[in-house]
């Protein structure tokens, strides 16, 4: 039974991270930027799982850390969406360009 080489996992993780980075740097909608940041975190999780599975001494450390990272990412997404809802109520927009002042 053939296994998938490590280079395939790493290539996929690099592609996911680059797509997320491109979206986070170029998009103006804050919700899309938040989704792109989550995509970058998932690329890092893919690296953790790939290195823990395909390393010299395979163990579950990377997979457990990846689950912990997913829980932190879910909390980050919930907090980010709550902040976005509060900003939308105050300014009626979620565009990044229009949120450049600290005072309302």
Curated annotation (Swiss-Prot):
NDH-1 is composed of 14 different subunits. Subunits NuoA, H, J, K, L, M, N constitute the membrane sector of the complex. Keywords: Cell membrane, Membrane, NAD, Quinone, Translocase, Transmembrane, Transmembrane helix, Transport. It catalyses: a quinone + NADH + 5 H(+)(in) = a quinol + NAD(+) + 4 H(+)(out). Belongs to the complex I subunit 4L family. This is NADH-quinone oxidoreductase subunit K. The chain crosses the membrane at residues 4-24, 31-51, 67-87. GO terms for molecular function: NADH:ubiquinone reductase (non-electrogenic) activity; quinone binding. It is found in: Cell membrane. InterPro entries: NADH_UbQ_OxRdtase_chain4L/K, NUOK/Mnh_C1-like. Its main location: membrane. It is a multi-pass membrane protein. GO terms for cellular component: NADH dehydrogenase complex; plasma membrane. The keyword Transmembrane applies. Pfam families: Oxidored_q2 (PF00420). NDH-1 shuttles electrons from NADH, via FMN and iron-sulfur (Fe-S) centers, to quinones in the respiratory chain. The immediate electron acceptor for the enzyme in this species is believed to be a menaquinone. Couples the redox reaction to proton translocation (for every two electrons transferred, four hydrogen ions are translocated across the cytoplasmic membrane), and thus conserves the redox energy in a proton gradient. GO terms for biological process: ATP synthesis coupled electron transport. Its EC number is 7.1.1.-.
């Amino acid at each position: 039974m053939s296994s998938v080489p490590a280079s395939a996992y790493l290539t996929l993780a690099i592609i996911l991270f680059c797509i997320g980075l491109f979206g986070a740097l170029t998009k103006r909608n804050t919700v899309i930027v938040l989704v792109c940041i989550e995509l970058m975190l998932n690329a890092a999780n893919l690296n953790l799982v790939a290195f823990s599975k395909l390393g010299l001494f395979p163990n579950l450390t990377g997979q457990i850390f990846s689950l912990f990272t997913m829980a932190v990412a879910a909390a980050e997404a919930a907090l980010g969406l709550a902040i976005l809802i509060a900003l939308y109520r105050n300014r009626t927009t979620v565009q990044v360009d229009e949120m450049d002042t600290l005072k309302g």
